[in-house]
């Protein structure tokens, strides 16, 4: 039997791919990366031609941990012969399709990645003190078994379907499947988008451009009271920092949950330029008469029904501020309702080794571990409730990976920043004395 790997990473989105790139030059670490997809593919249903990342190119797989890495976005541009074109373009923000191609380029250089491997079970062997990972090799159906001392989970967040649409018939779809169904949607008489974030805005803008040539009626319903822009001011961006994560993680769970609810416009808002482009396009479309489109704010989806005979959805909506219910009929239905983490079924044998909070979520330690010992199982993008809104941020991925690598190695390999912000988030340390008020 071969020696166990130092770690096995399960799932290969940008976060674990960054870990693969950053551990590649570390001879002391033997890692294996397993993913069920046939190749790297990041949100293929939202690869709109003009869509860009919402973070600058420096938030690539490696640069903020190791600017000299051969896996940097700039090195990708150089090898692709587009360095000067990107420079002349004068935008810090890569196209989303370009970022996906960059990730594919990086993945192709790594021998530690195994695509087409669907993990079925992870167990712990007490006698050998290793994790045993069972996987199906999808192209051949062969059963595979791997062993490792530590596990890193990067299985991503699946599309969230609201309760009102659970079990709903017809051909409604989540925005994750938008592009492959776009032509079929545009053949319908009416299309409705439900959701409030960047994906909903991008799809609305995309469909609004073609509304004249296809003749459909287009509706966008959002529960938010307005179309919130993504807050991107510099002092706010300092909250994507190690010290804010320190501060947030130390807060009581109830406070963290309350803050996360109030932080949605920090990571779920809409690019302000896109909001303005939508308004300008609406202005153009209304020059020669009313454009067949509606924008509904403060509008929650309460229930939904599907009539196969007419291929029509009837949505039960509620205007939240007025408390008034109404219905809306549509043939096409797109749910831009986000993604939510679910615990992978393959972890069931490890339930007793994992630390859980009172709400049944991972009790994620500051070092991103979830096992009760705090040193064996680590998570990527599953710690929103413990580490805050920076969890899905590509810009903090290299920092998190540097922290995880420090735990895997037992020492710091990439310098881990501890303080980068000008502002202070917590009260000063040390004894605090009440202010003495002198009598007047």
How does the language model describe each region?
Residues 1-38, 42-44, 86-198, 202-440:
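Flavin (primarily FAD) cofactor-binding/catalytic cores of flavoenzymes
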Residues 64-97:
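A conserved beta-strand/loop capping segment in the N-terminal third of enzymes
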């Amino acid at each position: 039997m071969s020696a166990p790997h130092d770690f096995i990473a399960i799932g290969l989105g940008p976060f674990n791919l960054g870990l693969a790139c950053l551990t590649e030059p570390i001879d002391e670490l033997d890692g294996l990366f397993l993913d069920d997809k046939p190749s790297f593919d990041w949100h293929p249903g939202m690869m709109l031609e003009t869509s860009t990342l919402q973070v600058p190119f420096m938030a690539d797989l490696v640069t903020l941990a190791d600017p000299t890495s051969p896996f940097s976005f700039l090195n990708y541009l150089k090898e692709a012969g587009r360095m000067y074109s990107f420079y002349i373009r004068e935008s810090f923000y890569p196209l989303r399709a370009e970022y996906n191609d960059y990730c594919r380029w990086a993945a192709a250089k790594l021998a530690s990645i195994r695509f087409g491997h669907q993990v079925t079970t992870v167990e712990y062997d007490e006698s050998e003190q290793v994790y045993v990972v069972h996987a199906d090799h999808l192209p051949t159906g062969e059963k595979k078994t791997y062993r490792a001392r530590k596990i890193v989970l990067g299985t991503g967040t699946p599309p969230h379907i609201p309760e009102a649409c659970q079990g709903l018939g017809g051909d409604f779809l989540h925005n994750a499947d938008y592009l492959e169904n776009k032509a079929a949607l545009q053949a319908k008489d009416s299309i409705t988008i439900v959701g409030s974030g960047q994906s909903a805005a991008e799809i609305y803008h995309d469909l609004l451009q073609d509304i004249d040539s296809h003749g459909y009626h287009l509706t966008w319903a959002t529960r938010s009271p307005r179309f919130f822009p993504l807050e991107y001011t510099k002092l706010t961006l300092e909250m994507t920092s190690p010290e804010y994560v320190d501060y947030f993680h130390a807060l009581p769970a109830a406070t963290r949950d309350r803050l996360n609810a109030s932080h949605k416009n920090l990571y779920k808002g809409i690019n302000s330029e896109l909001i303005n482009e939508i308004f300008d396009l609406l202005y153009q479309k209304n020059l020669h008469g009313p454009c067949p489109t509606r924008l509904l704010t403060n509008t929650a989806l309460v229930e939904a029904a599907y009539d196969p005979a007419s291929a029509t959805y009837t949505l039960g909506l509620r205007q939240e501020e007025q408390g008034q219910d109404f219905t809306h009929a549509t043939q096409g239905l797109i749910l831009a309702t986000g993604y939510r983490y679910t615990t992978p079924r393959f972890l069931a044998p490890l339930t007793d080794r994992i630390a859980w909070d009172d709400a049944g979520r991972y009790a994620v330690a500051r070092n991103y571990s979830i096992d009760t010992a705090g040193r064996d199982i680590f998570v990527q993008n599953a710690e929103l409730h413990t580490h805050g809104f920076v969890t899905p941020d590509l810009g903090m991925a290299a920092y998190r990976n540097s922290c995880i690598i420090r735990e895997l190695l037992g020492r710091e390999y990439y310098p881990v920043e501890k303080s980068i912000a000008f502002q202070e988030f917590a009260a000063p340390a040390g004894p605090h004395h009440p202010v003495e008020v002198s009598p007047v």
